[in-house]
A protein has these predicted regions:
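A conserved active-site cap/scaffold subdomain adjacent to cofactor or substrate pockets
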Residues: 217-302
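ATP/NTP phosphate-donor binding region
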Residues: 1-105
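Short alpha-helical scaffolding segments that buttress acidic/His motifs in well-ordered protein cores
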Residues: 184, 188, 238-252, 293, ...
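C-terminal charged capping/lid subdomain of soluble metabolic enzymes
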Residues: 2-16, 304-429
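A short, small-residue-rich loop immediately preceding and capping a beta-strand
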Residues: 100-135
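N-terminal low-complexity or amphipathic/hydrophobic leaders
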Residues: 29, 45-59, 179-183, 394, ...
């Protein structure tokens, strides 16, 4: 599948001049074997001292081949057990990276964690890196930030975006199905992310790019058509999934933020990853996003029932729930960080009168989101996790999460806006 990067750059009807950091994306069967040829051409032939970062599993999947193809490359191979994108993982990479005298480019061979550890270390060294994904498991391959758990804080750290992506669809097709299901969950999460973006746009005029929204909806349509193919290991279906995930990352570069890819569903996933009211859970990021999506879809569609009745009441003003934040985030430093994130109060931007006037438009936007049972059916096709219980939670985690998760990011979502409505407590249960 050919991805023409130039199609995503330049002047757009939204009024912005979209730019990308990544120079090229190659997504096709046998792409890995082209790596030496690609690196011998400009602008990549300037890099003479390459270091590959992988773990034991991704070394077997693709790293071993990269080592053969690129004679003399240095290899940092990590133990995948308990390997996370955190300060410990960063230190493990640095421990092997620091003794290497000359490094002018890094290569990440793996999925989400390996990429975040590589991009963070590349940023610290002020050198570029190349992405070699081994699974269609996450949308962050071309991200400009590293999603890190930093001393217990869930943070988006400034980091390097890859200058080149070489995604071999045969390797991706052969990845464990659980990783693929994680990617499906992450990509499906764009339904609520886009809805949150569109609702905020009509309420407070936040910038939005309709072209990016349409690109992502098109990728979602193709994903739905590819679900049977994914379960049958059809390489074309895997290319469609990988394309959608890469497109999501490119959309973030085009806008300069994560709005096109992250909404209330991601806030739930990130909240669980912080483990403030729950233990650490053994679930991939995309699995948590998929489960979060199901909860958000259920809440939003339940809200539509009340919106259609038109007899709801709205608060004149919604204050930050400081007591809830303090009760939830018992670590003093973390609590202060969350409070700072919510100062000023984003809901001050929402005019209740406008909120009521836009009811029909809000209903229309929410009805574009598949209902919870439809999402469950899609995830079942790829053997994905599909409930709170599947990731180790009890059903009451839905209400606990819905109330506080909006506060972990300085971003308006409909989940946060729901706090204006008198039916709020009923729909989050």
């Amino acid at each position: 599948m050919k991805i023409n990067i130039k199609e995503f750059t330049g002047k757009c009807s939204c009024g912005r001049d979209h730019q990308l950091v990544v120079d090229d994306v190659i997504l096709e069967e046998g792409a890995l074997k082209k790596l030496p040829e690609i690196l011998n051409k400009e602008p990549y032939n300037q890099y003479k001292h390459l270091v590959m970062v992988c773990d034991d599993n991704t070394y077997e999947a693709a790293g071993k081949e990269v080592e053969k193809l690129l004679n003399g490359i240095s290899v940092i191979k990590l133990d995948p057990e308990n390997l996370h994108a955190n300060e410990i993982g960063v230190a493990k990479v640095k421990e092997q990276l620091d003794p290497i005298k000359e490094v002018d480019c890094m290569i990440a061979v793996g999925s989400g964690t390996i990429h975040d550890l590589t991009r963070y270390n590349a940023y610290e060294r002020k050198i570029p890196f190349i992405s070699v994904p081994t699974a269609a498991s996450v949308d962050g391959y071309v991200s400009t930030v590293a999603a890190m758990s930093w001393y217990g804080f869930k943070k988006s750290m400034i980091a390097e975006s890859p200058i080149l992506v070489v995604a071999d669809s045969r390797i991706i097709t052969d990845a464990p199905m659980r990783l693929t299901a994680s990617g499906v969950g992450d990509l499906l999460g764009k339904y609520t992310a886009l809805a949150d973006w569109k609702i905020t746009n009509i309420l407070d005029g936040e910038y939005i790019c309709d072209c990016i929204c349409e690109m992502e909806y098109d990728a979602l349509d193709k994903l739905k058509e590819s679900l049977d193919g994914l379960s049958n290991r059809d390489i074309n279906a895997y290319e469609e999934l990988m394309y959608g995930l890469l497109l999501s990352g490119l959309a973030m570069q085009m806008t300069g933020h994560s709005r096109p890819a992250s909404g209330a569903e991601h806030h739930m996933a990130h909240f669980w990853e912080m483990a403030v009211i729950n233990d650490e859970i053994d679930a991939y990021h995309g699995e948590k996003v998929g489960v979060g999506l199901i909860q958000v879809s259920d809440i939003y569609h339940e809200a539509v029932k009340y919106l259609k009745e038109e007899n709801f009441k709205l608060e004149d003003h919604v204050d930050i729930e400081t007591d809830l934040i303090e009760k939830t985030f018992t670590n003093k430093e973390l609590c202060e960080s969350i409070k700072k994130t919510n100062d000023p109060n984003l809901l001050d931007l929402i005019n209740p009168k406008v909120l009521r006037e836009k009811t029909e438009e809000i209903i229309k936007i929410i009805e574009e989101i598949p209902k919870a049972d439809e999402i469950v059916a899609m995830l079942e096709k790829v053997q994905g996790v599909k409930s709170l219980e599947d990731i180790g939670f009890t059903p009451d985690m839905k209400e606990k999460t819905a109330g506080v998760a909006p506060y972990i990011r300085d971003r308006i979502t409909f989940m946060r806006i729901l706090k204006f409505y008198d039916f709020y407590d009923d729909v989050i249960k």
